Amino acid sequence: MALGTAGCSRIRDDDCVETIGIIGGIAWPSTIVYYRIINELVAERLGDDGLHSADLVLAQTDFEEIERNQREGRWDRVGVLLAEQGARLKAAGADFFLLACNTVHTADHYIENAVDLPFLHIVDPTADQLIARGFSTVGLLGSRYTMTGDYLVGRLQKWYGLSVLVAEGEHQDNVHNALYQELAKGEFLPGTRNKFKAAIAELISRGAEAVILGCTEFGLLVRPEDSAVPLVDTTVAHAVAAVDRALTSTLL
């Protein structure tokens, strides 16, 4: 279901607060980042005491099964597995939901059609940020599925008119392999960071005005100082958009 007008799951101090649904664990390290950013922003926006926290529910499935079906090209199965988690979110009272992972948005059409909740797509807040900052040509680092697929590149190009450059050859291999062999397991190695810096530099040499960190684990490894152009982290953009959505009525 496309994201629509904000509803209201409950009243807090006479204000409407929506419950955020998160399909996480894909992989678990970045789900922690979502949880931290969302709660920090809610605490910041709802009061000076810093004790407010988000209304949210989290569901996840076994990442090994997700990864195996990705590798086998069974995106329909990925969609089924994640849609099951979406149903759990709805039953738990979520008002809308997000996928805390870029790559599984490859199956977004399966999931969005199967889950009876508004869906906050990761690409849209990322594109909004890129456009607001005046970028027209952007580089992309992500899993191989993300860099060669259509859900992110196609959406940025067709819906938002952005030109997208993706890592190629050795750089694409290094980034993809690091994701599944290290980052998804919570391992962040200096040598791998250097490979990412080289991939970023290559994108900049081809004309990238900014580089999208198009995997929710990448921001745990790469830092702003690793790039000569701005880095746009999809995790941050997505988490901020979730809070914006949840608190829309509260802050009117």
Question: PLM features: what roles do these ranges have?
Answer:
Residues 3, 8-252:
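Non-catalytic structural scaffold of enzyme domains
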